[in-house]
């Protein structure tokens, strides 16, 4: 009988069947497995709405929507946009892109994510770590980057591959790999990335035009020293403006932590800094006839006035670089997912609900694929913007939609006003976010709990700081693996 039972056992499902089942389970989740059987006997409109609710979870949250929730979401979305617009532009410059690409990335990915994701809090946009990782890894490619258009093609293609990997992770249930990525490695990586981001922003803070593209400590210090020796390479006005408004932003943040009633001031401080510094730069540069004679380095003309342009034709699959771009896309996909899921879980727990990791991963992947086709670069969950959204009283993902539409309006009507925005102020805004990436308490906890993990953390930190982002990650992951053997 036992042999007969084995012989009559059903064949395992095919790979295609497993993929189809995974897609259904990820995109059409439902707590009651009998629900869809029940809906078969219901009118078509009811079945269609149930399907749409599962495909687009935001519809379920809108069933009990009211005027009070709309008011909260409108205020949170506008507050979020005021905070996000300068940050999006600053992160774009960190990725060595024009500021408008940061604004593009603050429109399409958040709108798509708001419709598809199970999270009610995560705010999507360009992140500082992703921007640094993207620019530093593309700069290591041994292919000629003739001009900015070639670089942009590489950026969009990497974003496309990152989205493909993220969707695959979600559909094939590989989300657990991201969740179990060593926390020690991530802590060390983020701390070193924060130092790298800070060092790179010295370029904008001092108004230096010619600066080393590498992110390791030795290269950046050497570039700074060369610029300082050449007095004409920088102007003290840039440092004065950048440092003054950096202190202002940090001071408002301090006030917000001390007094919750003043939290709003820290949210609007970046935009106030952009407005104030732009007025100062306009006054200082007013009498100069040519941009090269400006004493304060400014952004100059920013392309705007329209929706995100299509970038499908800018994807490149050249056999010389496509393998390298796939590798970069995989690395960035994992790093951005790790941060996004951590942010989502943290804020979901504060509101007493959970998120579906695999659905989040698929949603992030879809938005990055679509983003790569609409002039966006890699987008992920932002801790600082999610915190602003939470503290501003957001009720649903409608606040994210309000933010994205506000960014769109600013791109369409206000880009001309950003001409005199100092580069130093964008550097100051990014620098103000750097301390949040360095978690000394977590590093201390890792040291107390597991010395081997702390060595992996240290290896990742030193590797990123003195070599490159990619080498640092490899050292952190491999050292932890070998130390555990």
From Swiss-Prot:
**Record key words, sorted:** Membrane, Nodulation, Transmembrane, Transmembrane helix, Transport
- Work out whether the entry's keyword set contains Transport: yes
User: Which Pfam family would be a valid example here?
Assistant: Sulfate_transp
Where in or outside the cell? Membrane
**Is the keyword Transport assigned to this protein?**
yes
InterPro entries in the record = S04_transporter_CS, SLC26A/SulP_dom, SLC26A/SulP_fam
Renumbered to this chain, the signal peptide range is none
Annotated transmembrane regions = 74-94, 97-117, 121-141, 152-172, 186-206, 232-252, 262-282, 321-341, 361-381, 400-420, 421-441, 455-475
One Gene Ontology BP term is: nodulation
Its membrane topology is listed as: Multi-pass membrane protein
Give an example GO molecular function.
secondary active sulfate transmembrane transporter activity
Q: Gene Ontology cellular component?
A: plasma membrane
Q: What NCBIfam families does this protein's entry cite?
A: sulP
**Function per UniProt:** Possible sulfate transporter.
Which family is it part of? Belongs to the SLC26A/SulP transporter (TC 2.A.53) family.
Q: What is this protein called?
A: Early nodulin-70
- Organism expressing this protein natively: Glycine max (Soybean)
